[in-house]
């Protein structure tokens, strides 16, 4: 099947964005990541107007939904390029754009360093030997599965790169540490930062609940983190 691939391109934050279109003739079972790799393998790469263009900048590390690096807007919805297959998308035109909530680096690459900085500011590490209860093994495991891809932050109306609100990714990752930490002073520090950087800033729109590309039980983890950090349960 022949697909039209529309890509929003931009050389840097200071330059203007523009659209380029390419043709992909291949299997409907191909992933968007496979499409991008195939386009960049062309020498030279030409757009649909016949112009020779530079290779498309995008990120990937695993191609199997394990790293989160290939998160982007696919037909206006945040997804992972490696796990989004053409047959799951409507029509034969595929639109690719960078995530909009993070500073642009180039083309489909964004700088998600503020996501990781927010986790540091929440003090999400252990100061004591981890307490591991069999009763909370499953939610702790789910918390640890987070790819930190940023898809949940992309759809959050309360998150932006220049705000202190850390977003769902912080609450999801916080549960594991809140549940395992035994050192009370550090636990209180985490709880205080959690209230300031997540709980007090969440508008309860719940737009993050169904967007996770690996299907994390986001609502359950938010409830558990809130209970541990805010009410000490």
Give the positions of each predicted feature.
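Eukaryote-biased recognition of intrinsically disordered, low-complexity regulatory segments
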Residues: 1-22
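Short, thiol/selenol-centered motifs that function as redox-active sites or metal-ligating centers
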Residues: 5, 67-70, 149, 156
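Residues in well-ordered beta-strands of folded domains
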Residues: 6-8, 25, 83, 97-99
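Well-ordered beta-strand positions in beta-sheet-rich domains
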Residues: 18-23, 81-83, 157
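Short, flexible N-terminal segments of the mature chain
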Residues: 18-34
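Ferredoxin-type iron-sulfur electron-transfer modules in oxidoreductases and energy-metabolism complexes
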Residues: 30-51, 92-233
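A basic, amphipathic helix-loop patch mediating RNA/tRNA/ribosome contacts
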Residues: 40-75
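Glycine-rich phosphate/adenylate-binding loop and adjacent beta-alpha elements
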Residues: 72-96
């Amino acid at each position: 099947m022949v697909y039209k691939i529309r890509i929003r391109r931009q050389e840097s934050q200071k330059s203007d964005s523009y659209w380029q279109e390419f043709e992909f003739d291949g299997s409907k079972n191909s992933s968007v990541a496979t499409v991008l790799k195939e386009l960049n393998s062309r020498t030279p790469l030409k757009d649909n107007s016949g112009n020779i263009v530079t290779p498309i900048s995008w990120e990937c590390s695993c191609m199997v939904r394990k790293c989160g690096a290939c998160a982007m807007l696919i037909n206006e919805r945040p997804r992972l390029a490696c796990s989004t297959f053409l047959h799951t998308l409507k029509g034969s035109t595929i639109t690719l754009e960078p995530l909009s909530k993070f500073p642009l680096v180039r083309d489909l690459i964004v700088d998600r360093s503020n996501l990781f900085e927010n986790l540091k500011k929440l003090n999400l590490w252990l100061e004591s030997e981890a307490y591991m209860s069999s009763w909370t093994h499953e939610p702790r495991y789910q918390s640890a599965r987070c790819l930190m891809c940023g898809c949940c932050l992309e759809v959050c109306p309360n998150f932006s790169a220049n705000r202190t609100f850390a977003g769902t990714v912080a609450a999801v990752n916080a549960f594991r540490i809140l549940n395992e930490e035994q050192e009370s002073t550090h636990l209180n520090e985490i709880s205080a930062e959690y209230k300031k950087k997540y709980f007090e800033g969440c508008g309860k729109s719940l737009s993050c609940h169904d967007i996770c590309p690996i299907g994390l039980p986001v609502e359950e983890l938010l409830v558990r983190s809130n209970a541990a950090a805010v009410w000490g349960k």
